[in-house]
């Protein structure tokens, strides 16, 4: 009992209880639904995977997904394509925030131009989805969900990677900043990237397996 004018001090410990929430995807049926209840198989590439694998661009992060392969088909111009389930790049629909803003040419030359710092997550759906996403979604759909400005912040990073253990290096500098109003009704996210990759000639025949990238 506690009498008037007296204080009582008690010490107690709270046991940790981790609550895991279901992941939410929007690529399965064009509306937000839990990943567990999605009608099709959707793999999610989050920011943690980009950081763990030291992936600075979208194309590098996609290489770590099952059934997905990003390959360079031209060592002179840097032509790339995403293969899902073995089908060529034109059979894959690429979306940004669930909108098909990628043209056929951008889907070829834009994969290495999307910095990982602007990506919140990437939803990869393997299998046909032409009725939902258009005629290009035969092999699958890649939906890039970008970050939203939630608070004023900024980040500057630089990575340097040795290509094939040789004297060829990949230098990448990225900058992103988030600006929001005082009432949090409007916001702006700014992304910037400067990348220079030296050409890599594996067998010394005068033709680069990886083209120079600026």
Language-model regions, residue ranges each:
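Short, glycine-/polar-rich solvent-exposed loops and beta-turns at beta-strand/coil boundaries
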Residues: 2-6, 38, 67-78, 134-138
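Short, acidic, small-residue-rich periplasmic hinge/interaction motif at the N-terminus
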Residues: 3-51, 59, 89
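Structural signature of outer-membrane beta-barrel domains
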Residues: 31-33, 89, 101, 161-163, ...
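Outer-membrane beta-barrel architecture
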Residues: 60, 83, 143, 174-178, ...
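Non-catalytic regulatory/gating segments with a bias toward low-complexity or hydrophobic composition
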Residues: 62, 122-123, 142-144
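Short acidic/polar hinge/loop motifs at secondary-structure boundaries
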Residues: 81-83, 99-126, 147
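Residues that define the transmembrane beta-barrel architecture of outer-membrane proteins
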Residues: 136-138, 169-173
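Periplasmic-side early beta-strands and strand-to-turn transitions of outer-membrane beta-barrels
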Residues: 154-159, 165, 178-214
């Amino acid at each position: 009992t506690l009498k008037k004018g007296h204080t009582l001090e008690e010490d107690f410990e709270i046991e940790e209880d981790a609550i895991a929430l279901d992941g939410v995807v929007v690529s399965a049926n064009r509306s937000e639904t839990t990943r567990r209840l999605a009608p099709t198989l959707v793999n999610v590439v989050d920011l943690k995977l980009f950081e763990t694998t030291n992936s600075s661009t979208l194309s590098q992060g996609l290489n770590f997904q099952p059934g997905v392969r990003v390959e360079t088909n031209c060592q002179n111009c840097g032509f790339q394509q995403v293969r899902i389930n073995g089908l060529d790049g034109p059979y894959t629909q690429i979306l940004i925030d669930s909108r098909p803003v990628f043209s056929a040419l951008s889907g070829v030359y834009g994969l290495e131009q999307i910095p990982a710092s602007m990506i919140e997550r990437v939803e990869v759906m393997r299998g046909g989805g032409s009725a939902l996403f258009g005629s290009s979604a035969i092999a699958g759909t890649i939906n890039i969900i970008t970050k939203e400005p939630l608070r004023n912040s900024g980040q500057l990073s630089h990575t340097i990677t040795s290509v094939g253990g040789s004297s060829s290096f990949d230098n990448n500098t990225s900058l992103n900043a988030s600006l929001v109003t005082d009432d949090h009704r409007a916001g702006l996210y700014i992304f910037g990237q400067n990348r220079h990759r030296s050409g890599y000639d594996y067998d010394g025949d005068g033709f680069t397996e990886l083209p120079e990238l600026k």
